[in-house]
């Protein structure tokens, strides 16, 4: 997979290309990265790529021509069809399902905005999709782009050492992940649940599913409203709800 970022701050991406599982996979050649600086495509010797907005208003707007040229340059680096994504609070929310869809692609171009935004004509002519990481605003698109990259890359075969790590993550199954424990057996008076030390894989799997359902019900009940439960999940969820009713009565 080739991922390119159109950004005026290429150095920010060192954190994802050099460190952790994504950095290791990058060194192994499982995925490639290129930062494309639109300043190199500016039509002035100072590299200005922004100007005042028509109609007035605060801040500056990133101009369409240098961004368009940067995107076209990025597309030309691969024979594969590229999907151009603009990281924007106005986009559709990034979900696990969307990350899984993007992980199937071979070439992504991530457009990282700055200042007050980007000329709308560039978005209409060159961007395939706008994606948001949440209902809040940050200073630029670089951090959202890296969050999207990390979410996508961990689903690419070969990047995680154990594919089960991705399969057991929160949202991969549509519900939140279960609690996890490691040594020591006791910490500040809290012991590791006995079932996890039993060696009974069937009981452990059922306990983990029950805890996932319990945590999802407490923290993200909206996920359960959208989910079609299998019989085992229905049984465990009914058990949890019955326990809650008994506590309240």
Swiss-Prot record:
Location in the cell: Cytoplasm
InterPro entries (alphabetical): Alpha/beta_knot_MTases, tRNA_m1G_MeTrfase_C_sf, tRNA_m1G_MeTrfase_TrmD, tRNA_m1G_MTases_N, tRNA_MeTrfase_TRMD/TRM10
Cellular component, GO annotation: cytosol
GO annotation, biological process: tRNA N1-guanine methylation
EC assignment: 2.1.1.228
Reactions catalysed, as given in the entry: guanosine(37) in tRNA + S-adenosyl-L-methionine = N(1)-methylguanosine(37) in tRNA + S-adenosyl-L-homocysteine + H(+)
Annotated keywords: Cytoplasm, Methyltransferase, S-adenosyl-L-methionine, Transferase, tRNA processing
S-S bonds: none
GO molecular function, one term: tRNA (guanine(37)-N1)-methyltransferase activity
Binding site for S-adenosyl-L-methionine: 113, 133-138
Family: Belongs to the RNA methyltransferase TrmD family.
Function: Specifically methylates guanosine-37 in various tRNAs.
Oligomeric and partner information: Homodimer.
Protein name: tRNA (guanine-N(1)-)-methyltransferase
Annotated organism of origin: Neisseria gonorrhoeae (strain ATCC 700825 / FA 1090)
Lineage, opening ranks: Bacteria, Pseudomonadati, Pseudomonadota, Betaproteobacteria, Neisseriales
């Amino acid at each position: 997979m080739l991922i390119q970022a159109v950004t005026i701050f290429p150095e920010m991406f060192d954190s994802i290309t050099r460190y952790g599982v994504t950095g290791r996979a990058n060194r192994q050649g499982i995925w490639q990265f290129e930062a494309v600086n639109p300043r190199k495509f500016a039509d002035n010797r100072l590299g200005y790529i922004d100007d005042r907005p028509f109609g007035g208003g605060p801040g500056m707007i990133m101009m369409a021509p240098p961004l368009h040229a940067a995107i076209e340059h990025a597309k030309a680096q691969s024979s594969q069809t590229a999907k151009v994504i603009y990281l924007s609070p106005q986009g559709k929310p990034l979900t696990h399902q969307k990350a899984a869809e993007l992980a199937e692609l071979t070439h992504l171009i991530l457009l990282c905005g700055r200042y007050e935004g980007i000329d709308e004509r560039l978005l209409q002519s060159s961007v395939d999709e706008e994606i948001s990481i949440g209902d809040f605003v940050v200073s630029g698109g670089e951090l959202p782009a890296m969050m999207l990259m990390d979410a996508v890359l961990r689903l690419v075969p070969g990047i995680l050492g154990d594919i089960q790590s991705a399969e057991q993550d929160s949202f991969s199954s549509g519900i939140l992940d279960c609690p996890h424990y490691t040594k020591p057996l006791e910490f500040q008076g809290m012991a590791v649940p006995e079932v996890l030390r039993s060696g009974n894989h069937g009981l452990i799997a059922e306990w983990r599913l029950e805890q996932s359902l319990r945590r999802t019900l407490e923290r993200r009940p909206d996920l359960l409203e959208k989910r079609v439960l299998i019989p085992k999940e229905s049984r465990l969820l009914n058990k949890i709800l019955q326990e809650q009713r008994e506590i309240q009565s």
